């Protein structure tokens, strides 16, 4: 898990997300508290439960982006789900327990990668020996068996040196590799994904591990052999236990669009995809045991972060029990023109940097001037005010419209330089921005 301090986490988030300091601080503290809890003695550690977070803010202000960036920083099992995909237990659709099953699968992949990386050095040595056995086959005795290993011959050592220096990378060899498991595609109804994955595992294990000869360049064979040898050094039972521990102690679940499962008005019939889902989420958030294919997972110490725009519904429309289990409330602010300007220039790999790089592949140089950036930000903000406010996502629409002609003609403009200033932006966008009907459909 991540050992970054809250200040370091916020600093890392600042590289990609503009503004929303309160939300960044809250998730940074929550992430650091995961590490702090693990430093306590076992008895007290069991009593410290995570303080779940509810992020409230209009669409396009950075709620989902915070989750995406947090997933990379956490170095812990992390899953992002949409609340609208689930239905109450007993009805057609996904059950909320599948969140924990998917989280366990994510943890399993993560710990497998870590275990393979841990054994990489030994795996590289073993892969090297297998390639050398193909290049210089070991001597056979009278019964056709490999003789007992002796001191490496001078020829073998010479080939080993060439192999390590990359001199043999493009040489083709034929080598036996583990055959890919038998692929069985099973169409399952919603809610039966767990049974499907178990059936697929059963069919894959029927064939056993078979070797299949393949002709490859040495550099490609080396990669596949390292993976194969590393997988042999990994203990599957230990992996399962490590994955379950990682989920229980460090797991993070991000539930997006939680406002869409709030009850709206009086309803006579069963509300299976709204209030029913909230009731099913309660035991997960409070703490229960969920059965997964890797083992039983306790959810007592999993951190839940929920987010929603709450434009139609209010946080108070959530059922009271769920409100109580999301004690930390963070409000994200709507973005201003200044925020749009910063979004266009400050983040690593900002939208303008992406467009410059894309056009550079055709030999076209694009330059955005300061007044051009300001005019783009103003246009995006103006369209948001007069039509639906979709936050920073509007910048993608406006910029795509702005560089459409350049993108189309880029292959004929090789070697040219184009400056996008306030006049260029006004020429291409003013008519659309001013006409509300046009901007509603085009921008």
Swiss-Prot record:
GO terms for cellular component: HslUV protease complex. ATP binds at residues 18, 60-65, 256, 321, 393. GO terms for molecular function: ATP binding; ATP hydrolysis activity; peptidase activity; proteasome-activating activity. Keywords: ATP-binding, Chaperone, Cytoplasm, Nucleotide-binding, Stress response. SMART domains: AAA, ClpB_D2-small. InterPro entries: AAA+_ATPase, ATP-dep_Clp_protease_ClpX, ATPase_AAA_core, Clp_ATPase_C, HslU, P-loop_NTPase. It is found in: Cytoplasm. One of its GO terms (biological process) is protein unfolding. The keyword Acetylation does not apply. CDD domains: RecA-like_HslU. It holds the Pfam family AAA. The keyword Chaperone applies. A double ring-shaped homohexamer of HslV is capped on each side by a ring-shaped HslU homohexamer. The assembly of the HslU/HslV complex is dependent on binding of ATP. Belongs to the ClpX chaperone family. HslU subfamily. ATPase subunit of a proteasome-like degradation complex; this subunit has chaperone activity. The binding of ATP and its subsequent hydrolysis by HslU are essential for unfolding of protein substrates subsequently hydrolyzed by HslV. HslU recognizes the N-terminal part of its protein substrates and unfolds these before they are guided to HslV for hydrolysis. This is ATP-dependent protease ATPase subunit HslU. The lineage of its organism: Bacteria, Pseudomonadati, Pseudomonadota, Gammaproteobacteria, Enterobacterales.
